Design a protein with these regions (language model features):
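Composition-driven recognition of glycine/serine/threonine/acidic- and proline-rich low-complexity segments
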Residues: 2-178
Length: 178
C-alpha cells in the first residue's frame, strides 16, 4: 500500500465493506461446518509491515495461514491466519476428528481442510467486495503454510514491499455461537 492517509470516512467505508464481506464469509463457513458462527465488526487499520507479526501473536508464534492472490481491476492478496489451537479446532470440526494434547503437526488432510475453509472464506469475502465496489476481481487457488508468523508473512511482505511499506488490514474475528 502506498504511503497515503486514509480519512476517517474512507476507513468507515472499508469497515462496512469488510463487515459485509465477513458476514457473507461467516454464512458460507456456517453452512460448510453445519455450525452457528458469528463475526465481530471488523477492525480496519493500516499497519507497517513490521507491525503485522505482532498483531498475530509475534514473529515466533506458530500459526496456520491460507494465502490467496486476487487480480482484476485491482490486485492484492488475502491472508487468513489462525492460531494453532484455532486451526486444530477448525480442521477437527470439518474432518470430525480430535487431536491430542501432544499435537505438533498437521497431516495432508488437515492442511487440505484448512485450505478449503480459507478458500471458501476468502472467495466469499472477495466476491462481496467485488459486488459492492463494482470491481471485476478473480481469485487464485490458495496456498497454506503452518510456520512461525514471521516466516508466514515473508512472502506477502516481499511482494507488497515492491509497492510500499504498509498494508491495509481488515481484521475479522469469527466466533462460535455456542
Amino acid at each position: 500500500m502506498k504511503d497515503q492517509e486514509l480519512t476517517s470516512m474512507k476507513l468507515d467505508v472499508l469497515r462496512e465493506i469488510g463487515n459485509i464481506g465477513a458476514g457473507n464469509a461467516t454464512t458460507a463457513l456456517s453452512v460448510m461446518l453445519n455450525s452457528g458462527l458469528r463475526v465481530e465488526v471488523p477492525v480496519v487499520k493500516v499497519l507497517k509491515f513490521d507491525e503485522i507479526a505482532d498483531m498475530i501473536g509475534g514473529p515466533d508464534t506458530v500459526v496456520a495461514a491460507v494465502l490467496t492472490h486476487f487480480t482484476g481491476e485491482v490486485s492484492g492478496m488475502t491472508l487468513f491466519v489462525l492460531e494453532l489451537e484455532e486451526a486444530k479446532n477448525l480442521a477437527g470440526t470439518m474432518l470430525n476428528k480430535t487431536y491430542g494434547d501432544d499435537f505438533t503437526t498437521f497431516d495432508h488432510m488437515d492442511k487440505s481442510a484448512l485450505k478449503e475453509i480459507g478458500n471458501i472464506l476468502m472467495s466469499s469475502y472477495i466476491s462481496s467486495i467485488s459486488t459492492l465496489t463494482n470491481l471485476k476481481l478473480s481469485i487464485a487457488p490458495p496456498a497454506i503454510c503452518v510456520d512461525m508468523a514471521g516466516s508466514v508473512l515473508s512472502l506477502p511482505i516481499s511482494e507488497l514491499g515492491q509497492i510500499g511499506d504498509k498494508a491495509l488490514i481488515i481484521d475479522s474475528k469469527f466466533l462460535d455461537n455456542e
